[in-house]
Amino acid sequence: GVYFQAFYDDGFCCLMENEITKKYYAMGQEPYIVLQNAKEIDAYKIYKVMVIDYENRAALERLRDAVAKEQFPFDSFFSSPWFYEFCPKGQNKGAGITWLVKHLGIAMKDTIAVGDEENDVSMIEAAGIGVAMCNARKEIQAHADFVTTRDHNHSGVAEVAKKFVLEAQ
């Protein structure tokens, strides 16, 4: 079944430790706390909730479809085939790159963003050049200015750097 984790500045919290917790921890060694009850979550400044199902993406898609029918004060999207995330409205990668270019004093037209999942769409659309990896689903690729011929495990980002940075000079 589905499992959830709530993220705060120092890691994530969950209601039970199980194989999903351990698998997620093994990916990034992010510290976590097992809560004794759901009310304890109020002690943390949560910035994201992730619903995980490593075995049944269809369950996550049903959740996405149900959420889409409602008016909630948050954005939701897939960040991988197994992770469906919720965060406050407007806290996304597109907002992040917009803030960063202002902070650094550079023009948005001079940026490149590369992504492969729903959580990358806002960034791909915001960047001067939005790139989708070839292994991204077609609906993600539709938002991009360019689609790589290689995926992220086979030098896809290097392909982007060569085409838009090295060869452009």
Language-model segment annotations:
Residues 1-114:
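Conserved acidic, metal-coordinating active-site core of Asp-based
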